[in-house]
Every structure is written in structure tokens, then in C-alpha cells.
């Protein structure tokens, strides 16, 4: 007996097989450029969907935040435990111009610094730079044994308060008189933490002091000229180079345009 129409269509899916498309075929790569404070300028790449209709790719990239190790931003492999956040401020061609957005330490570095038989001092302070950025600094310090201490390096509560006040004073002094570019240049070798340890050691011996974290709380209004200045090195950049001309060169006269 021949099958009925209902039996012949049993097990057949509606619509047939869907066409599969590669999701990466609609995306394009953009290069991320770090500010001039870092030696490795072209540090990473990022993906974005191509411009379609009113959805512009460059506008979708603005505000994107990436986190990179200092080892990727410079040639100093011994400082890979420092992580810097960069935020895309402007897009020029296929280059994303970024700006400093924060700093942090890796988890294993923090866990390796915290030891028993010592006191841990933590301090935080909000400081405003000369160019209008409000930054929050988190500093961590550790005590070490004095000559009359044998088994531990604990500090008294009164000394811990004095140490914390001295650390806050040093951070405010070093940051308030600098712009953002100078602050980042101090964060790369952590000269702020070193200065805090040197001055606070007069109160109680310290084995180390580090800027543990930096947050950007407030930014000034976006200024494209300031961003371009932050990415300039005082010489020709990758976006264009000067063409050598002979002395007394005059461009040819064009008859028609």
C-alpha cells in the first residue's frame, strides 16, 4: 500500500538545512596603540563588527577597556606582575589611541608578599593631578624586624597609624604636582612606593612598599589635541613621515584641478 501524504512528510524538518556563516567574516581587526610612556606602542589587537548602516565600527571601539601586563607594554620582564588598564579614546584609521585607565597587581604577587610574623599597613588616598584627573591610590607596606626583635616584626598600633599617615603624605606630594603622563612614568618603576618606604622607614623599618592599585575616579572633558600629544614622541609617527626635499624646492604649478 502506498504511504499517505502525512506519512511521507513524517521526520522532515521545516525550512531545510540552515546556511552556516563564519562569524569572523563580518568583523575586522584594529591595532591598539599605547601612550608614549610605554616602549611597546603597538601592544595588542581587538575585533569589532564592520560598519553596517548607522552602526559605525569606530564609535563602538571608543570606551573599550583592555588590561595588559607591563611585560607586554615594555621590555622589562621583571615587572610582569603589574597590570595596566588602557581605554580607547579615539580611532584614527585602523589605530585605536588609548589612555591610562588604572593599574593593579597580580594575585600571586600580593599573596607572595603577605607573610606571617610581620605587620601589614594598607592606605588609600584620592589625589587630583594638574591636568584634572582624580586618581585613587592604594598602597601596601610591610614591616621588618628591628634589632631588638627576635621572633616577629609586629609594629604597635600608634606606629602603624603614623606609617599610614606618612605614606598618604608622600603619595599626595608626589602626585598632586604632576600631570597624568608623569604619574604613569612614576608608576612603571613604582618610584612612589619606593619614596614612601624610604621616608616611612624612619618611623619603623619596612621591608617593602608598593602601589597596589590605582583607580581613575574622574576624567576631564575629552580633548583630542591632548590625546594626540599623549601619543606623540616629538618625531614622525607611524601615521605619516616627512618627505625629504632638496634646498629651495618649489612645488610644480598645476594648470587644472
Curated annotation (Swiss-Prot):
Pfam families: Ribosomal_S3Ae. InterPro entries: Ribosomal_eS1, Ribosomal_eS1_euk. Residues 1-10 have a biased composition (Low complexity). Residues 238-250 have a biased composition (Basic and acidic residues). GO terms for molecular function: structural constituent of ribosome. Its main location: cytoplasm. Keywords: Cytoplasm, Ribonucleoprotein, Ribosomal protein. It comes from the Eukaryota. It is found in: Cytoplasm. GO terms for cellular component: cytosolic small ribosomal subunit. GO terms for biological process: translation. Residues 1-24, 238-257 are annotated as: Disordered. PANTHER family: 40S RIBOSOMAL PROTEIN S3A (PTHR11830). HAMAP family: Ribosomal_eS1_euk. Belongs to the eukaryotic ribosomal protein eS1 family. Component of the small ribosomal subunit. Mature ribosomes consist of a small (40S) and a large (60S) subunit. The 40S subunit contains about 33 different proteins and 1 molecule of RNA (18S). The 60S subunit contains about 49 different proteins and 3 molecules of RNA (28S, 5.8S and 5S). This is Small ribosomal subunit protein eS1. The lineage of its organism: Eukaryota, Metazoa, Spiralia, Lophotrochozoa, Platyhelminthes.
Amino acid at each position: 500500500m502506498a504511504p499517505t501524504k502525512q506519512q511521507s512528510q513524517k521526520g522532515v524538518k521545516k525550512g531545510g538545512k540552515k546556511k552556516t556563516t563564519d562569524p569572523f567574516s563580518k568583523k575586522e581587526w584594529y591595532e591598539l596603540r599605547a601612550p608614549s610612556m610605554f616602549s611597546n606602542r603597538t601592544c595588542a589587537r581587538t575585533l569589532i563588527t564592520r560598519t553596517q548602516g548607522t552602526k559605525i565600527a569606530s564609535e563602538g571601539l571608543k570606551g573599550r577597556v583592555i588590561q595588559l601586563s607591563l611585560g607586554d607594554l615594555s621590555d622589562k620582564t621583571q615587572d610582569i606582575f603589574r597590570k595596566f588598564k588602557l581605554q580607547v579614546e579615539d580611532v584614527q584609521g585602523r589605530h585605536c589611541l588609548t589612555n591610562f585607565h588604572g593599574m593593579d597587581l597580580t594575585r600571586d604577587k600580593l599573596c607572595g608578599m603577605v607573610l606571617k610574623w610581620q605587620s601589614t599597613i594598607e592606605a588609600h588616598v584620592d589625589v587630583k593631578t594638574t591636568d584634572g584627573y582624580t586618581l585613587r591610590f592604594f598602597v601596601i607596606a610591610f614591616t621588618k624586624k628591628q634589632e631588638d626583635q627576635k621572633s616577629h616584626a609586629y609594629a604597635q598600633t600608634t606606629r602603624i597609624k603614623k606609617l599610614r599617615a606618612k605614606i598618604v603624605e608622600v603619595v599626595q606630594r608626589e602626585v598632586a604636582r604632576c600631570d597624568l603622563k608623569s604619574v604613569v612614568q612614576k608608576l612603571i618603576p613604582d618610584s612612589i612606593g619606593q619614596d614612601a618606604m624610604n621616608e616611612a622607614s624612619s618611623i619603623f623599618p619596612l621591608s617593602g612598599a608598593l602601589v597596589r592599585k590605582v583607580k581613575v575616579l574622574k576624567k576631564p572633558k575629552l580633548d583630542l589635541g591632548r590625546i594626540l600629544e599623549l601619543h606623540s614622541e616629538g618625531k614622525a609617527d607611524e601615521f605619516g613621515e616627512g618627505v625629504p626635499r632638496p634646498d629651495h624646492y618649489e612645488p610644480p604649478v598645476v594648470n587644472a584641478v
